[in-house]
Amino acid sequence: LALVQLGGSWGLTMDERIAGTMLITALVFAVAAAPIFLFLKERAQPRASSLGALTSADGLWTLAGQSFREICSTLKSLGRFRDFAWLSLCGFLYQSGIAVVITLSAVYAAEVMGFTTVDTLMLVFLVNITAAVGAFGFGYLQDRIGHKRALGITLIVWVLMIVLAAMAVNRPVFWTAANLAGLAMGSSQSAGRAIVAILSPKTRSAEFFSFWNMALWLAAIVGPLAYGSVTWITNNDHRLAICVTGLFFAAAVLALIPVNLERGRRVAEETDAASRGTTSDH
């Protein structure tokens, strides 16, 4: 933000200043990731067959086939893990809405609210601060009121944010909506992952988290595609498009209702017990 604000006095054009922020972002990523690569020990041991497969094209196709079969196996088992299935649907729905906020909030701010580039960068900066506060604060709230209830509250905050953004005709209202988005963004993602950990059998945690991530990646496509389709059909009616985005969050609230954490935890524990029994028999 300082580069964008002060870069003009250094003779930099706006394009050069924005490009410079990308370099700063890359540096921040490198610094943040360095401790992981330097100090975090890898406990999992890769399968020798998988390492060998990476050295040839046929081996890569074999690994891809195995991965696809494992995804199909996870899908078939969702009938038993119905609480995880409902949670995955909930995550897909609310992440579709979040993907719109992340990728298209700058477009909405510029087209509807008349934000300049500097205004938009300031918006992103402050929203990230409120996202950090939301993730930290709601972490304590989750421990006090429960993960499902905390996630439900954040989804309602998302719905309120959409209503404010769609109705905003002045900047203070839009800024309020943006900061609500920041508070809900960090907390909804952390609450979702916490519930996945509860509903996942320990012996299949990587499989379940992979399926959860796949649902979120699919949402990153569906959400912006839905927003873009509405603006294209309605000749750039961004307010209607953001209202449609709100339907994702409203549907996520409904998908969260059937999730029963105690039942899901019990099924996960039974699966682990059965897995240990099978292992001991061998």
Where are the model-predicted features located?
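Short amphipathic helix-loop junctions that connect adjacent transmembrane helices
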Residues: 103-120
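Structural signature of the two symmetry-related core transmembrane helices
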Residues: 149-164
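Multi-pass alpha-helical transporter architecture, strongest
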Residues: 28-39, 243-275, 281
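Juxtamembrane intracellular "pre-TM" segments in multi-pass secondary transporters
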Residues: 42-87, 281-282
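Helix-to-loop junctions at the C-terminal end of transmembrane segments
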Residues: 133-147, 231
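A membrane-interface helix-boundary motif in multi-pass transporters
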Residues: 2-27, 229-249
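Intracellular juxtamembrane helix-capping segments at the cytosolic ends
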Residues: 187-201
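Helix-loop junctions at membrane interfaces in 12-TM secondary transporters
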Residues: 166-178
